[in-house]
């Protein structure tokens, strides 16, 4: 359908001679330069989630149910801030492309503040809805208690470290600093999130709260590293 529409001469963009189209290898390489590290980062994140889930599965059905619901709630309270981060990538990309590096720095700071406000509001709303959700879901009393405690922990810790660990990174990726972001994210996830979770669960007998302690450690380390990187301004030296 798209090909047929493109052949319509009344369209603003009309393509009716496909045999004349040739790949722009230079442009493709620049796209892959950004896309491949991001893809590796996301793949490692999925492997990490699998490793954590395999550890949680050894804690019993009560812990599994509590952690599953908490995961959903944690995803919900981060949606608004993630949207800010995705929008930031477009804004920073345009600023860097136009050579306005000062504006890129300004917008990263400004949208980080907006994301922080979104995180605080979202966390409070989700926390207020936690008990009604566990009741509507028919969760066992012990699972509901674990879920409430983990959601409380997230509500306290997420506004402290989440924004610094993710929002500046969106902007730095848009500026072409993708390798540093990939290495930092993968290293902090495996060294903090996965390792802490497995260690606390299997050595000290922690319950599913170990997952969120590990995640908070991951966010904190990542936030510190990305903050140092942001203030160093080295991420502005890339050419896309």
PLM features per residue range, with description:
Residues 1, 20-51, 55, 76, ...:
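Hydrophobic faces of transmembrane alpha-helices in multi-pass small-molecule transporters and flippases
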Residues 1-36, 92-158, 201-240:
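Short alpha-helical transmembrane segments in multi-pass integral membrane proteins
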Residues 1-2, 82-85, 154-174, 180-192, ...:
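Short runs within selected transmembrane alpha-helices of multi-pass transporters and secretion channels
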Residues 6, 46, 127-128, 136, ...:
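Conserved catalytic core of Hanks-type protein kinase domains
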Residues 38, 42, 51, 63, ...:
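Short, flexible micro-motifs
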Residues 43-47, 119-127, 190, 194, ...:
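Hydrophobic positions within alpha-helical transmembrane segments of bacterial inner-membrane proteins
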Residues 43-76, 94-95, 132-141, 201-204:
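Helix-terminus/linker motif at the lipid-water interface of multi-pass membrane proteins
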Residues 64-130, 162-186:
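Small-residue-rich hydrophobic transmembrane alpha-helices
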């Amino acid at each position: 359908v798209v090909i047929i529409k493109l052949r319509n001469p009344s369209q603003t963009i009309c393509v009716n001679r496909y045999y004349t189209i040739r790949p722009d290898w230079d442009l493709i390489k620049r796209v892959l330069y950004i896309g491949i590290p991001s893809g590796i980062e996301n793949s490692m994140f999925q492997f990490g989630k699998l490793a954590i889930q395999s550890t949680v599965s050894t804690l019993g059905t009560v812990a599994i149910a509590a952690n599953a619901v908490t995961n959903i709630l944690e995803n919900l309270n981060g949606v608004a801030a993630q949207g800010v981060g995705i929008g930031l990538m477009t804004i920073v990309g345009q600023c860097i492309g136009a050579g306005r590096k000062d504006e890129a720095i300004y917008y990263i700071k400004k949208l980080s503040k907006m994301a922080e406000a979104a995180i605080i509001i979202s966390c409070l709303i989700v926390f207020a809805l936690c008990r009604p959700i566990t009741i509507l879901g028919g969760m066992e009393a012990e699972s509901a208690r674990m879920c409430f405690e983990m959601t409380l922990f997230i509500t306290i810790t997420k506004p402290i470290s989440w924004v610094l660990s993710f929002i500046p990174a969106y902007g730095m990726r848009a500026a072409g600093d993708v390798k540093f972001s990939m290495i930092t994210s993968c290293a902090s996830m495996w060294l903090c999130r996965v390792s802490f979770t497995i260690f606390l669960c299997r050595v000290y007998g922690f319950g599913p709260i170990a997952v969120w302690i590990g995640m908070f450690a991951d966010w904190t380390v990542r936030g510190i590293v990305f903050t140092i990187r942001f203030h160093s301004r080295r991420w502005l030296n890339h050419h896309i």
